[in-house]
A protein has these predicted regions:
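Phosphate/NTP-binding elements of NTP-utilizing enzymes
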Residues: 1-187
Length: 187
């Protein structure tokens, strides 16, 4: 695997980042810990990461509206709420109104819409890590927050109440699951 750091562009790319950040701060909460149940708040570093993560090709490009990056990685020091951030992004990707895909343009800016039938494996080295860390945080964020009515959240999977889309904790590579079309992954 080759990791490439994108160049600092002089021109800003269109991004769904502002819409994703607004969704997170309007509807999601902190998971287990001192801030449990408090409204989600993004610092400037996490906001910049989300803006970059959700950059799309411009309207006049042959791939207009498609994500600029297929994969993104984030490395932060311990205690920087990485698990919370992953759970918040997974919740936005899972929600039936999450503005995570470009569905059109308004005044040259991308409009965000949901994934039709998301499949989100939440992968860790061990099953215990998966359940106690990110999936456990995702469960808390959606089960104890304002979006609880939109999800059927359980200890083994969380999905939309309408039946389309789910997030599942896994302790192995998602590619080993035949027939599963991964739309977003937390590892």
């Amino acid at each position: 695997t080759v990791l490439t750091v994108p160049n600092d562009d002089k021109d800003l790319w269109p991004t769904l980042g502002p819409q994703v950040c607004e969704f997170i701060e309007a509807y999601l909460i902190f998971g287990p810990g001192d801030l449990r149940g408090m409204p989600a708040r993004l610092d400037q570093e996490k906001r910049a990461f989300i803006y970059r993560m959700y950059e799309v090709f411009p309207q006049d490009h042959p791939q207009a509206g498609r994500r600029r990056f297929k994969r993104v990685g984030l490395s932060l020091a311990k205690g920087q709420a990485k698990t919370e951030l992953a759970a918040w992004i997974a919740a936005a990707e899972l929600h039936q109104e999450g503005p995570v895909r470009c569905i059109g343009w308004r005044n040259g800016a991308p409009l965000g819409g949901p994934v039709t039938d998301p499949y989100i494996p939440i992968v860790s080295y061990t099953e215990q890590q998966t359940e106690e860390l990110c999936y456990g945080t995702l469960y808390t964020v959606i089960h104890e927050g304002p979006l609880d009515r939109d999800f059927d959240a359980g200890l083994t999977k969380s999905g939309r109440r309408d039946g389309d889309g789910r997030a599942v904790p896994l302790a192995a590579a998602p590619s080993a699951r035949d027939g599963s079309l991964t739309t977003f992954q937390v590892a």
